[in-house]
């Protein structure tokens, strides 16, 4: 259940989530209809078989999960059937259907195929830190994160969440760290980075599995390249890649964090899930607060 990526948003800490368990059932995920392409709604963080519990709260952390069902209609299949239909009409009527007629034919085919299409299920998890006013979505896609914000908005009626905004240019901070400026306490460089020329269409250099402080890196910095992605390690607990878009990718929980689970005395699957949720939430909070200071992240009003 550990998150692998983090797309972060901020929201005012004054928001009231006390009625969340009452507000979620009306926007629970419903099965995608025969003539629908997709369906979205909340599901239980504990899995689709759990129908009663649609959220999970532990102290100031709230766990929400948006589920999805999408019909799979391969474009190649639709286009192949469309061409056959067009050929039949051309042979029968001696003319080839125009653009509008082809669009109608395609829409008819899709409606015909939808009830028989396979359904792909998905889930996107999010943790809300109610004390510090941020939400961490388990995705590297901004669009996926925005979709989760939209679902929460639909449940609450209003949810003024905004993407992270840094008061200093993230590229400048990341470039400074790799150039030798002191990192925040507990943070150290990993073995991966991406550097770009600041000009449009400029060169891109990707480094992996190598020391990030050395002559090779220095030459790229001297040539004016800026760091757009940087691998970092937080103590022995987390490793991740921070982008200049403020998205955290390749998040991994290390032994320093996982060892805490081994000392848990709770038994049972739900107790283990609770322990993992508590650990993950606390580590993400620690990382967020560190980045909030280092990058001067704006607060939501």
UniProtKB/Swiss-Prot annotation:
One of its GO terms (cellular component) is cytoplasm. It comes from Xanthomonas axonopodis pv. citri (strain 306). This is Recombination-associated protein RdgC. Pfam families: RdgC. May be involved in recombination. HAMAP family: RdgC (MF_00194). InterPro entries: RdgC. Keywords: Cytoplasm, DNA recombination. It is found in: Cytoplasm, Nucleoid. Belongs to the RdgC family. GO terms for biological process: DNA recombination; regulation of DNA recombination.
């Amino acid at each position: 259940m550990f998150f692998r990526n983090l797309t972060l948003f901020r929201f005012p800490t004054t928001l009231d989530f006390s009625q969340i368990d009452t507000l979620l059932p009306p926007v629970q995920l419903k099965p995608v209809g025969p003539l629908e392409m997709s369906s979205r709604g909340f599901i239980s963080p504990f899995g689709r078989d759990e129908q009663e519990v649609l959220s999970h709260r532990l102290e100031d952390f709230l766990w929400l999960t948006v589920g999805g069902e999408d019909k799979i209609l391969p474009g190649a299949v639709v286009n192949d059937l469309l061409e056959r239909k067009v050929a039949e009409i051309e042979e029968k009527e001696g003319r080839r259907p125009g653009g509008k007629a082809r669009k109608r034919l395609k829409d008819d085919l899709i409606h015909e195929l939808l009830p028989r299409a396979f359904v792909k299920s998905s889930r996107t998890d999010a943790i809300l830190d109610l004390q510090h006013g941020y939400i961490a979505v388990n995705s590297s896609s901004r669009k996926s994160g925005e979709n989760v914000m939209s679902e929460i908005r639909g449940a609450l009626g209003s949810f003024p969440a905004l993407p992270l905004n840094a008061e200093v240019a993230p590229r400048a901070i990341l470039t400074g760290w790799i150039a030798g400026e002191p990192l925040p306490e507990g943070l150290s460089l990993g073995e991966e980075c991406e550097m770009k020329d600041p000009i449009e269409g400029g060169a891109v250099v990707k480094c992996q599995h190598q020391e990030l402080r050395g002559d090779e890196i220095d030459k790229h910095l001297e040539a004016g390249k800026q760091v757009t992605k940087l691998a970092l390690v937080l103590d022995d607990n987390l490793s991740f890649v921070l982008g200049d878009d403020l998205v955290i990718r390749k998040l991994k929980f290390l032994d320093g964090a996982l060892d805490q689970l081994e000392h848990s005395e709770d038994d049972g699957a739900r107790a283990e899930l609770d322990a993992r949720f508590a650990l993950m939430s606390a580590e993400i909070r620690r990382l967020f607060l560190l980045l909030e200071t280092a990058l001067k992240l704006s607060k939501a009003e």
